[in-house]
């Protein structure tokens, strides 16, 4: 098997038709479309009689983990956020060998594994790539001011405050 091809996420646009104008105008929405990542898997059963049961077991494992992170060993430190998983038809190549395709529907961005870690509020993480949409979990009591990309937010916290910028 070979490493899968990873598609580039497409920008989303509003299409504007103006009467009397050649062509259309496009306005960026500031969002990306989901990307499908297709991976071909194969498996070898110990016994030909176990072939179908082995595939059912593999399907259960994929479907149990239908969301989460998709990482590749040749691109350490990064992952894709999986939104759904579709499992294709199991092809029997030989009595004990099966092959099937899994399509992972992922968000259009790649994420740093380091960015998913909890950090102290005084820490700064510089993202040299795409715009990020972090989740802030702030614990404590009192007034807190959070500045992100030049935008300042002040909140009175009484225990715990969660700010999810991906919503």
Where are these regions (language model features)?
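Solvent-exposed edge beta-strands and adjacent loop segments
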Residues: 1-36, 76-90
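Intrinsically disordered, low-complexity segments enriched in serine, threonine, and glycine
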Residues: 110-167
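Short, surface-exposed beta-strand/loop "edge" segments at domain boundaries and coil↔beta transitions
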Residues: 47-49, 77-81, 143-146
């Amino acid at each position: 098997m070979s490493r899968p091809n990873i598609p580039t996420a497409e920008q989303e646009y509003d299409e504007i038709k103006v009467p009397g104008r050649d062509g259309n105008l496009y306005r960026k929405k500031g969002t990306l479309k989901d990307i499908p990542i297709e991976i071909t898997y194969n498996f070898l059963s110990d016994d030909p009689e176990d072939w179908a049961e082995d595939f059912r077991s593999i399907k259960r494992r994929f479907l149990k983990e239908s969301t989460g992170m998709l990482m590749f060993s040749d691109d350490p430190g990064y992952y894709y956020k999986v939104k759904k998983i579709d499992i294709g038809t199991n092809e029997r190549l030989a009595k004990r060998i099966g092959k099937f395709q899994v399509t992972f529907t992922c968000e259009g961005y790649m994420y740093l594994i380091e960015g998913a870690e909890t950090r102290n509020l005084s820490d700064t993480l510089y993202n040299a790539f795409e715009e990020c949409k972090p989740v802030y979990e702030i614990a404590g009591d009192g007034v807190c001011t959070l500045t992100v990309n030049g935008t300042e937010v002040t909140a009175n916290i009484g225990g715990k405050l969660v700010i999810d910028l991906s919503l």
